[in-house]
């Protein structure tokens, strides 16, 4: 316990002083090792070896943490020095230092393996509020100065990589904890957090019902679901893939919330609401899920902003002293959902018809061998990206905001 408190104090003092432990420098020289869904399944198979998994994670997790810590350090000083970002940085340093301690302990000792699981649980819990805390840091930074286009571009680049890094480390920790922890809390049909036979329609239905419950509570009404399945590989059979149901649920829940809100608000004077239509198609390479609504759509000029961390129409949430800030209000739903899709080489796109509705499409890999982690690595290319400037546009482009015609002078 004393050692843990010492590590925590050391991490915070190093972070606040702008210093980087030599362990961060050491592990940042290595590139992360992406795993495929198939490899993750093999790690958790019936013949799974806890020692092998532990040996991999005690090396891989510090590498992933160190790589993203190096990127935090090249962000604007005013952002890095905010209390929120300093707190996140101290969490990452503390977690890295705790994991590195296991390099000095025997991997053949069962007590060490048990302690490693406990440490992973501690790290996972410590990082629980990383997303809202970093988001609060961005808000503090935006409130303190004007964010120029170059910085805005760099922050979008960084946050995509930072949150993808978090998704990946959380995935690895959850797999090991669920498979090797003494407390069996996972689904018995799953391997860790992965369902080898994920029923896509069932996840769609569950995410829809969760969203519908919120919609009913807020609007006292909600649209129905119209679900269509097309199995191009095995016609007529239900669609199953190897995937992480919680990741898919996260994406669908966010998209359904948006679709329902738009539908109810756009059709508030209609006698009935048009259903949200979902089409699930399994092809040879991809699983595609299309969510279509008749919620009026959004203008083209706004579509790109929907995936921006720096743009949100929601009121800014207030964090309490315990740092327990809600995600709602940060406007991170869509960009984080797209990262979940991209994590295993998929994607998420929005196609909107202003005045009619929106199609949201999730693309996932159909084969587990092709579902490979998409991981950020801190190298010369990444460093150069933060040094790039935006060249002057060589096209004459009008303002992206619509003109207020009431203020325009009428030409005589």
Curated annotation (Swiss-Prot):
Induction: Up-regulated in white adipose tissue during hibernation. One of its GO terms (cellular component) is mitochondrial matrix. One of its GO terms (biological process) is cellular response to fatty acid. Keywords: ATP-binding, Hibernation, Kinase, Mitochondrion, Nucleotide-binding, Transferase, Transit peptide. Signal peptide: none annotated. Its EC number is 2.7.11.2. Detected in heart, white adipose tissue and muscle. SUPFAM superfamilies: alpha-ketoacid dehydrogenase kinase, N-terminal domain, ATPase domain of HSP90 chaperone/DNA topoisomerase II/histidine kinase. One of its GO terms (molecular function) is ATP binding. The keyword NADP does not apply. It is found in: Mitochondrion matrix. It catalyses: L-seryl-[pyruvate dehydrogenase E1 alpha subunit] + ATP = O-phospho-L-seryl-[pyruvate dehydrogenase E1 alpha subunit] + ADP + H(+). The keyword Ligase does not apply. The record marks 157, 161, 395 as: Interaction with the other subunit in the homodimer. Gene3D superfamilies: Alpha-ketoacid/pyruvate dehydrogenase kinase, N-terminal domain, Histidine kinase-like ATPase, C-terminal domain. ATP binds at residues 254-261, 293, 312-313, 329-334. Pfam families: BCDHK_Adom3 (PF10436), HATPase_c (PF02518). Residues 138-368 form the Histidine kinase domain. Its main location: mitochondrion. Kinase that plays a key role in regulation of glucose and fatty acid metabolism and homeostasis via phosphorylation of the pyruvate dehydrogenase subunits PDHA1 and PDHA2. This inhibits pyruvate dehydrogenase activity, and thereby regulates metabolite flux through the tricarboxylic acid cycle, down-regulates aerobic respiration and inhibits the formation of acetyl-coenzyme A from pyruvate. Inhibition of pyruvate dehydrogenase decreases glucose utilization and increases fat metabolism in response to prolonged fasting and starvation. Homodimer. Interacts with the pyruvate dehydrogenase complex subunit DLAT, and is part of the multimeric pyruvate dehydrogenase complex that contains multiple copies of pyruvate dehydrogenase (E1), dihydrolipoamide acetyltransferase (DLAT, E2) and lipoamide dehydrogenase (DLD, E3). Belongs to the PDK/BCKDK protein kinase family. This is [Pyruvate dehydrogenase (acetyl-transferring)] kinase isozyme 4, mitochondrial. It comes from Rhinolophus ferrumequinum (Greater horseshoe bat). The gene is PDK4.
